[in-house]
A protein has these predicted regions:
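Short loop/turn segments immediately following beta-strands, especially the blade-tip
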Residues: 1-3, 43-49, 89-97, 135-142
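A short beta-strand motif characteristic of beta-propeller blades
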Residues: 5-12, 49-58, 99-105, 146-151
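Beta-rich, blade/repeat-based domains predominating
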Residues: 12-29, 57-73, 104-121, 150-162
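Conserved beta-strand positions in repeat-built beta-propeller and related beta-rich domains
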Residues: 24, 32-36, 78-82, 124-127
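Oxyanion-binding "anion nests"
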Residues: 33-45, 50-79
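Structural signal for beta-propeller blades
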Residues: 38-40, 84-87, 130-132
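C-terminal structural cap/anchor segments
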Residues: 65, 69-109
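Internal helix-turn-beta structural module
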Residues: 121-156
Length: 162
């Protein structure tokens, strides 16, 4: 009938500012990027008990924005804006917790990004630069900026989706 039923509450630390979440079905984990604290919260599913708090925003700018899991499930990426704009890179461990393995600088104000279904590219909407940057995802999860770029005249791209 299209109705939604309440399943559970996901407890988030006070002042963290939960923004977006991503499921990892392979290991029954939920990842939450927190805009204000700059953390990724890792939860067990279906209990929603908090397993890990790991810092993603390197400078505590209070502008963490988006989170996406690589199609392989091996890497998690988060975007950060307002200062030291970029993408944090995490390796997903066997138990679904995270290990931070890198950071890739982007254009200004990367509010949103997407990973192509084949897992080869990561596209970032750099709102304050009026462009979309294209990164190649390497075998080790690292990001390499490609020469490909989409430029816009005063359109301030803020969301990408397929």
């Amino acid at each position: 009938d299209g109705a939604l039923d309440h399943f559970a509450d996901v407890p988030c630390p006070s002042g963290s500012g939960p923004r977006h979440m991503e499921f990892n079905e392979a290991v029954d984990r939920l990842y939450c990027i927190c805009e204000l604290s700059g953390e990724v919260l890792v939860y067990d599913v279906p209990t929603f008990s908090l397993l890990q708090r790991i810092q993603a925003d390197e400078v505590n700018a209070g502008g963490s924005a988006d989170v996406h899991l690589h199609p392989s499930g091996q890497y998690l990426y988060t975007s950060h804006r307002l200062d030291n704009d970029g993408i944090s890179i995490f390796k997903t461990l066997a138990d679904g917790t995270l290990e931070k393995i890198g950071y890739a600088r982007t254009g200004r104000h990367p509010r949103n990004f997407m990973i192509t279904p084949d897992g080869k590219l990561l596209l970032v909407a750099c709102m304050n630069d009026n462009l979309v940057q294209v990164f190649r995802i390497e075998a080790d999860g690292a990001l390499t900026l490609t020469p490909s770029v989409l430029r816009f005249e005063n359109d301030r791209p803020s969301c990408l989706t397929l």
